Amino acid sequence: MVAANHLGIKTIIHEQNSIPGVSNKLLSHFVNKICVSFKESEAYFPKKKTIYTGNPRSEEILSMEKGKREDFGFNHKSKFIILVMGSLGSLTMTKKMKELIPSFKDKDYQVLVVTGKNYYDDYKDVKTPTNVKIVPFYDAKYMKDADLIITRSGASTIAEVTALLLPSIMIPSPYVTHNHQYKNAKALEDKKACKILEEKDFCKENLLSLIDDCFKKEVYNEMRKNLKEFSCPNSAETIYKEIMRLVRNEE
């Protein structure tokens, strides 16, 4: 980017997290345009260069065909929850989730537990209630039929839940650089658009209590309403237009 700047080549960067990383902060002094996923990020960059565009993942998931909970043997009589800790899964969370799963017995909701491909075999000894299905991975299209998701809070996940106005319980990974996931989730929680349960506080009592709270009508509707503030369904198109403005020297 710096070399391109010296050569007179137009440059644009996109910051996916709510609190920018060191690289983009440094590059912001050299590039022509800065696109951000969170309104809160604008304060960290030169005002004249910065535009709030959201994350292109929003547009991608909205264009997907809707997955059906029936594919997992679930119905529409009860709420449908997805519990996922990333595509690979998490060793720490696997231990906690194995203890949690039997507690879903007799609950009036259905739970799809996505283990991640690295830890699926670890669940073979778990006594699984009839309202729980355990799978190694899933397609994000099933988020479109979910009532609640319990998940990490990486930039792509934030883009997905905000695009779908999907209430969530975020469990930020404490192992990422600069604690980005917690900061992403906190941006939503501060606007009452999600719930946060830190990994160190994760236990079946805390999670079950949060699930019950999320399904209270007034809480659920408030989260969906507040998620609209973060939703950018035309993100990719907006970024494309900014790129073309640079190409045409219209900035």
Segments and roles (model prediction):
Residues 2, 140, 158-166, 186:
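Short alpha-helical segment that forms part of, or immediately flanks, the ligand-binding pocket
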Residues 5-66:
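Active-site-proximal region of nucleotide-activated glycan assembly enzymes
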Residues 9-10, 147-148, 165-173, 193:
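Structural loop-to-beta junction motif characteristic of Rossmann-like glycosyltransferase folds
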Residues 25-28, 40-49, 121-129, 143-144, ...:
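Short loop/helix-cap segments at secondary-structure boundaries that form the rim of catalytic
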Residues 66-67, 74-149, 182-185, 190, ...:
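Donor-nucleotide binding loops and adjacent catalytic segments primarily
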Residues 144-159, 166-167:
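Acidic donor-binding loop of glycosyltransferase active sites
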Residues 219-233:
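A short, well-ordered alpha-helix in the C-terminal region of glycosyltransferases
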Residues 232-251:
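C-terminal alpha-helical cap of glycosyltransferases
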